[in-house]
């Protein structure tokens, strides 16, 4: 648990280690080791470790998950698709959190939020299966009111709002519209009693506005940290992101946006 969790400015950083595994798999080597990266990220201030075990195992593989689980000191947040195989793995491994995400083999990265409205029965059943195994469930969804309501109705206690459209906005006006959608989504989630996280596409120059939203409990960030680490080192990259997030939250609470 980080020091920042004891302050009014509490906001957690979940460091996603997927692209450490991507770098490893590019040459089929045993390095860089994503488990080592996870443990170093915790030492540098990460509040959780996020990893996505995709069906095609394009980056994280089963051995990474199994090796990391008993060694993680903060929380493991395992992202996975709503499939029997992945749910069985999650129930066996029992991460602290399981974030259910949509998945397509053709995509480079997750392209949007889980359609809870359209797949309500399957998602609700998955939530129950995971909860019965003692795993806290999060649903990765777009900041859409109908999706947020449906997420609440599944019994999931946590949502993670997809920030990809905000991150990929082509101009300031579009980015502002997407930011307002996220802010509205945060308020809607909190009103329903949900813990609200956010993530996807956030980096060192666009995270400030999102981190400043007082209702967001956690941001999950990976690619930007891995990329920045090439130039400043892994520990520094994690520390810098956490510092930026906390500074943005503190400034917002004190009227200094």
UniProtKB/Swiss-Prot annotation:
It holds the Pfam family PdxJ. Its main location: cytoplasm. It comes from the Bacteria. 1-deoxy-D-xylulose 5-phosphate binds at residues 18-19, 54, 59, 109. GO terms for molecular function: pyridoxine 5'-phosphate synthase activity. It is an enzyme of class 2 (transferase). 3-amino-2-oxopropyl phosphate binds at residues 16, 27, 201, 222-223. The keyword Hydrolase does not apply. Disulfide bonds: none annotated. The active site is at residues 52, 79, 200. The record marks 160 as: Transition state stabilizer. GO terms for biological process: pyridoxine biosynthetic process. It catalyses: 3-amino-2-oxopropyl phosphate + 1-deoxy-D-xylulose 5-phosphate = pyridoxine 5'-phosphate + phosphate + 2 H2O + H(+). Pathway: Cofactor biosynthesis; pyridoxine 5'-phosphate biosynthesis; pyridoxine 5'-phosphate from D-erythrose 4-phosphate: step 5/5. It is found in: Cytoplasm. The keyword Transferase applies. Its EC number is 2.6.99.2. Homooctamer; tetramer of dimers. Catalyzes the complicated ring closure reaction between the two acyclic compounds 1-deoxy-D-xylulose-5-phosphate (DXP) and 3-amino-2-oxopropyl phosphate (1-amino-acetone-3-phosphate or AAP) to form pyridoxine 5'-phosphate (PNP) and inorganic phosphate. NCBIfam families: pdxJ, PRK05265.1-1, PRK05265.1-2, PRK05265.1-3, PRK05265.1-5. Belongs to the PNP synthase family. This is Pyridoxine 5'-phosphate synthase. It comes from Burkholderia pseudomallei (strain 1710b). The gene is pdxJ.
């Amino acid at each position: 648990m980080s020091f920042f969790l004891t302050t009014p400015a509490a906001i957690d950083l979940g460091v996603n280690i997927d692209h450490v595994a991507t770098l490893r798999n590019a040459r089929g080597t045993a390095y860089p080791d994503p488990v080592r990266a996870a443990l170093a990220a915790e030492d540098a201030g990460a509040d959780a470790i996020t990893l996505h075990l995709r069906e095609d195992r394009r980056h994280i593989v089963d051995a990474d998950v199994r090796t990391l689980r008993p060694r993680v000191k903060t929380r493991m947040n395992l992202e996975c698709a709503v499939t029997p195989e992945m749910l069985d793995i999650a129930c066996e491994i029992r991460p602290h959190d399981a974030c259910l995400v949509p998945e397509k083999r053709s995509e480079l990265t997750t392209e949007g939020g889980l359609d809870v409205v359209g797949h309500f029965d399957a998602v609700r059943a998955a939530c129950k299966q995971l909860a019965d195994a003692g795993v806290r469930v999060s649903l990765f969804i777009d900041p859409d009111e109908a999706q947020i309501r449906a997420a609440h109705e599944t019994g999931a206690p946590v949502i993670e709002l997809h920030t990809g459209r905000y991150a990929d906005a082509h101009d300031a006006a579009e980015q502002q519209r997407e930011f307002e959608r996220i802010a509205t989504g945060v308020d809607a989630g909190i009103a329903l009693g949900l813990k609200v996280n956010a993530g996807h596409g956030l980096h060192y120059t666009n995270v400030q506005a999102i981190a400043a939203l007082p209702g967001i409990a956690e941001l999950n960030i990976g690619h930007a940290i891995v990329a920045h680490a090439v130039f400043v080192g892994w520990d520094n990259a994690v520390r810098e992101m956490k510092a930026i997030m906390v500074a943005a939250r503190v400034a917002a609470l004190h009227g200094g946006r």
